[in-house]
């Protein structure tokens, strides 16, 4: 079969297209999924670059987000049939291994993928396999961060940094569905216009203005007595954006984070932390319940995942370049 392997740590030259990669066979309690689409995520790029303290067996077919149809059933599999449309939950939950599909075992950048049947989620007929493939790492993460961990409710003011990437766009869409007033930050006029089309209430081009100044102009400077600022800042950027995020929060506000793409060594101003009684809430990954809820939102016509481009498997390196050069709005998919 055709597959793209990450053969070593380094730049995009470590990606190899194979046309003779062995077809997988299902083990006990496994199925073979004929991959319709797989999403490209920064996790794939981090896997290729190498992550300190995390050993990845190489070569490996990455691609954690994938959806398709069941092509074969292993022994012991019940409740599923060949041809069933499925989304794969990438986090291995069978108790046998720790890690993710596309990390500790081959993933979706191939025509076929072997996965434990316990990882399967049925895709409603109203949902395209492309939309399903866009969900786990971006929309699943955003759902858990905003709803399960962040407790965002209607009427709250939510500032989203890095709002044009996969997780950021998902946060804007879900916060709007929750009834929040959303301020979305991005780095170009084109991305700002697309965020407006997603119904972001306010937008900030942070190459032209500081987001903390924009927030204070919109809602006023936070006051110890209450008022001003936003209720929630979604910040998975990290780096030097952390203290400015604190400066945006109203009394009792909270920062939600699921990562730190600009750097893990954060500077926190403890004065804002105690004076404004701020919360800093971490969120890690997603749940199967959240993925099912997202599929139901799509089926009901309430959510449409933002898919920027769909490229053939042969253009995997270009897909990763688009992410690395920040030329993507939402998600990029590969078609094996």
Which residues fall in each region the model found?
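C-terminal hydrophobic helical "lid"/dimerization subdomain
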Residues: 1, 288-336
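Glycine-rich beta-strand-centered segment in the early N-terminal region that forms part
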Residues: 22-38, 51-92, 124-126
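Residue-level marker of beta-strand positions
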Residues: 65, 84-85, 112, 157, ...
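Mid-domain Rossmann-like dinucleotide-binding core that forms the NAD(H)/NADP(H) cofactor-binding site
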Residues: 85, 130-208
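N-terminal Rossmann-like NAD(P) cofactor-binding module of classical short-chain dehydrogenase/reductase
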Residues: 87, 233-234
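Glycine-rich phosphate-binding loop and adjacent beta-alpha segment
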Residues: 178, 186, 236-306, 336
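Short amphipathic alpha-helix with an adjacent loop that forms part of the alpha/beta core around
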Residues: 211-227
